[in-house]
Curated annotation (Swiss-Prot):
PANTHER family: 40S RIBOSOMAL PROTEIN S15A. InterPro entries: Ribosomal_uS8, Ribosomal_uS8_CS, Ribosomal_uS8_sf. Keywords: Ribonucleoprotein, Ribosomal protein, RNA-binding, rRNA-binding. It comes from Prochlorococcus marinus (strain SARG / CCMP1375 / SS120). GO terms for molecular function: rRNA binding; structural constituent of ribosome. Pfam families: Ribosomal_S8. Signal peptide: none annotated. This is Small ribosomal subunit protein uS8. Part of the 30S ribosomal subunit. Contacts proteins S5 and S12. GO terms for biological process: translation.
Amino acid sequence: MANHDPISDMLTRIRNASQKRHENTRIPASRMSRSIAKVLQNEGFISQVSEEGEGVKTQLVLELKYSGKHRHPTIRSMKRVSKPGLRIYKNNRGLPKVLGGLGVAIISTSKGVMSDRDARKQGVGGEVLCYVY
């Protein structure tokens, strides 16, 4: 079956694996998924990103993070904002603060995919891909 929104698919796979407390999850590799995974790793939501396979069958393996003795997921919620049917763009002044700065908005800018904090520092806006907190 064709996947029409790979970003939503990626977020759903991470959300489901995190709720079931899996150690890692596999995601089809693309430039966008690599960039989003890198932002999630830099922001401390996942511990490690690695690649397996070759060519078209390359997959990203994301090692998820948990906290406490009951292994509470670090990622509480992931919400897709800009969708294929309704794109959401914001300038650098209009970039959202997720949970008053506790969460992260992942933004696709002309300078690459980055967190809302990095986009504000660089003074760029772009497409708001998702919220993570």
